[in-house]
Amino acid sequence: MRLSMKFRFIFKVIAIVYSSFLFAQNGILNVGFDIDDTVLFSRDVFLNLPEDKRNPMDWGWINSHDDDYSQLITPTVDLIHFFHKNGHNIFFITARSKPKGKNLANFLTDKLMFPVEVNKNLFFSPRETIKGTRYTTKQRIMKRLRLDLFYGDADTDMIAALKAGVHPVRVVRHKASIISYGPNYFGNTIDKISPKNPFSMEDLNIFYSSNVGIFGESIYPIFWEGPQK
């Protein structure tokens, strides 16, 4: 019994030392990125999802077809390379579900030119439904990874970062995605103006020019030119 307790104590000390080395190195940041509409323009993956795989959503199909339909959002990729080349730790947190997640990891590895592995630097964090409303769960992983920064396009990304005590940075969603996916972006700028959604498309330019969003988040100022035909 005493021996077992001793080993548990030693293991705990080792875990604390390792955690401190990984997460508290001087000058090293832990930087997180959303995937869809942040790293990848993946609209066409979802638009090409076969009808018989839509309800429920076949995430295995989605995670297996980025190579066919997704395009890199180059300003974000340049930023990822900047952090990576300067020795900072890079993590990806997506609201996608995990089936065939290794295919997404392999795609990112090939395109970003450094190893991306599930549950090592790629994490799947699908939303949870509570009383009929779907809520983000990304803040749990952000806390566990002790992120310093999180880059994402959606309102839920900003909320998750704030809940986790992480500095949020908004990556400006391309207009083609705003039109396709109005909700979860400054409320919903393509719906009719309402108390719930008070901001118009014109209001976005005011936010963009001020480099601050509705949650007090920073706005990354280099915009993507858009998908290639």
Predicted regions, residues:
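Intrinsically disordered regions, especially transient/low-confidence alpha-helical propensity segments
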Residues: 2, 56-58, 170, 221
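Internal hydrophobic scaffold segments of catalytic domains
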Residues: 25-39, 156-168
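C-terminal cap/substrate-recognition subdomain and adjoining C-terminal extension
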Residues: 97, 101-229
